[in-house]
Design a protein with these regions (language model features):
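Catalytic cores of nucleic-acid endonucleases
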Residues: 389-429
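Accessory nucleic acid-recognition modules appended to NTPase machines
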Residues: 204-371, 375-379
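Short glycine-rich substrate-engagement loop in P-loop NTPases that contacts/grips substrate
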Residues: 56-89
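Interdomain motor-coupling "hinge/lid" segment immediately C-terminal to the ATP-binding subdomain
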Residues: 131-254
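Hydrophobic positions on the alpha1 helix immediately C-terminal to the Walker A/P-loop
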Residues: 37, 41
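N-terminal pre-Walker A segment at the start of P-loop NTPase domains
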Residues: 1-17
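Structural recognition of the conserved hydrophobic beta-strand(s) that form the central parallel beta-sheet
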Residues: 94, 118-124, 145
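Conserved lysine of the Walker
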Residues: 34
Length: 448
């Protein structure tokens, strides 16, 4: 199928409208769609596009040998390939896979000062060495974090209009349940998205074929590619330990207590044995880390128990690819999430919150039954968010709302495989509405 519309498209258009725009660095994990998005934008907006990939074209690493000025770099690019034409104010220079040549970031200052050519850089695993890139280009670049497709982008790919999405938000704002037909349709679409994840190549293949056939092979290959990246780029750390941590995540999430435990990585494993591994995976964009609050109250920063956290895979489709063969067959044949239902729903919600710009926080105490899956905040409140694989009553949430101790909590949000509803101070939304939470929070009156 053709190009899949992405939210990054609108960001790129706004970036180009800015007369004082800086060179742009687009970060994101492998295969989230960075290169195709940039290429499409470039074709539609520039007369000349100079694309250099530092993995497939390592010969271009010499372009800084005479210095980092825009003039020197343009001259050497032209010497390597005289067919590349540089026309002032009509040319985009696209440096791809810069994780293999972070030195190019030094040139961004000089391209900004030159002002005659637009520059976009992109790469995977940039977070791993981003301090270095950031320090040599501070003040002369704009950063943009790109993720795999969220559920809204999946709906666009399936042909759904902005009108349909606006109608979903109206149901949330007005507290009106979806019709039975709508509920079934959107729930089925949501299950498709959960099984596939948001990697554009996988989504595109599924829509073209109208079947899950082949999707698991693509997911498995991506999982292999991620693990190969760990081996290639994990410098200064024990690569085997990082791999072990990454491979343990599905089992960690399958536990009733989803707190990350190093004893589940290896027998007798301790946090000091795996120092830096979780941080590396987070910086690489492969996982999302949910921090445990010491107390369910504001502020969030400075209120974290650093010894406790949960770890989620950054794309739920990659988590699905890690499941056992029997579950894979059942998922694709019957859309049955089985014993992994709780893990997949929770991973999806974590992923959706991150893609909306929220930090991840939860609450749990070893000597208490009081616990919450996630928290988000409004202007005046801390809002607990519960992920319910079944229809239980959210006892912890009600206890927090009624508590005289935790006065920052007055309302709650429950996400489940049900319909829209309001009961006392708790609003309930179906999982397929999760991507709209930030817009809901910005427009509703309940939490103001």
């Amino acid at each position: 199928m053709g190009y899949l519309v992405r939210k990054a498209d609108a960001f790129l258009r706004e970036w180009k409208k800015n007369p004082d725009r800086k060179p742009l660095i687009i970060k994101g994990a492998r295969q989230v769609g960075k290169t195709e998005t940039i290429r499409t934008f470039a074709r539609e907006n520039y007369k000349n596009v100079i694309e250099i990939n530092f993995i497939t074209e390592p010969s271009y690493k010499v372009i800084v040998e005479e210095g980092f000025s825009a003039e020197h770099i343009i001259k050497l690019i032209s010497r390597i390939d005289p067919t590349k034409h540089f026309e002032e104010n009509e040319t985009l220079i696209f440096f791809d896979e810069i994780q293999d040549f972070p030195e190019i970031a030094t040139a961004l200052k000089f391209f900004k000062e030159n002002g005659k050519y637009d520059v976009i850089c992109s790469g995977s695993l940039l977070g791993v060495q981003y301090q270095r890139i950031a320090s040599i280009s501070v003040g002369y670049k704009t950063d943009y974090q790109m993720y795999s497709m969220d559920f809204e982008e999946f709906l666009w790919a399936k042909g759904y209009s902005e009108e349909a999405i606006s109608d979903m938000l109206c149901h949330m704002l007005e507290g009106v349940a979806f019709s039975e037909a709508e509920q079934v349709i959107f729930s089925n679409l949501f299950l498709e998205y959960c099984i596939l994840g948001g990697m554009p190549a996988i989504v595109s293949s599924y829509i073209e074929r109208e079947t899950f056939e082949g999707s698991l092979d693509l997911q498995h290959q991506l999982l292999v590619d991620y693990e190969n990246d760990i081996v290639k780029y994990a410098q200064g750390l024990d690569k085997a330990k990082i791999l072990s941590v990454y491979r343990s995540i599905p089992a960690q999430l399958a536990k009733e207590n989803k707190k990350f435990q190093y004893s589940k990585v290896s027998k007798g494993g301790r946090s000091k044995d795996y120092m830096g591994c979780v941080e590396w995976l987070k910086d690489a964009g492969l996982i999302n880390v949910c921090e445990c609050l010491q107390f369910p109250e504001l502020p969030l920063k400075g209120n974290v128990d650093e010894s406790k956290y949960k770890v989620y895979i950054s794309d739920t489709g990659i988590l699905v690819a890690s499941l056992d063969d029997e579950s894979q067959i059942d998922l694709r044949a019957n859309k049955n999430l089985g014993i992994y239902k709780g893990a997949l729903y929770e991973n999806f919600v974590a992923e959706a919150l991150v893609k909306q710009g929220y930090g991840l926080y939860y609450y749990s105490k070893d000597n208490s039954t009081l616990e919450e899956d996630f928290f988000i905040r409004s202007a005046n409140e801390l809002i607990p968010v519960e992920v319910k694989a079944n229809t239980n009553r959210a006892k912890s949430m009600r206890q927090l709302i009624k508590s005289d101790t935790y006065t920052d909590i007055k309302h709650g949000i429950k996400l489940m495989a049900g319909n829209v509803g309001i009961s006392e101070n708790i609003v309930t939304f179906p999982y397929f509405c999760t991507f709209l939470l930030k817009r809901y929070m910005g427009k509703q009156n309940l939490f103001q």
